[in-house]
Amino acid sequence: MEIAYTKTTLANGLDVILHEDHTLPIVAVNVWYHVGSKDERPGLTGFAHLFEHLMFEGSAHHDHGYFPPLQDAGAAGNGATIPERSNTWEVVRTGALELALFL
């Protein structure tokens, strides 16, 4: 099975991979960071996973946590850390895409 997509690199170096499927009125956003547990030093482990969880606590632009606004929008989201990467993801109604990208 082949899935059609486009890939663009923004001026800030962020790679954007886009696949469009208009079957349902939802959007999935998945942000990958090219850092994971393999980047940790022996004896100093767990930081990649810690930072993944800290992403859910808010930011300078949004200090109310990650999950409440997604839940209010009827969305689902989570994150993961593996040796090669850390990521966060959201699945939202198309009308909540800006929220998912903002968080």
Predicted stretch roles:
Residues 101-103:
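Short amphipathic alpha-helices in soluble, non-transmembrane regions
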Residues 1-25:
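N- or domain-start disorder-to-order transition segments that initiate the globular core
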Residues 28-98:
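M16/MPP (pitrilysin/insulinase) zinc-metallopeptidase core fold and M16-derived inactive scaffolds
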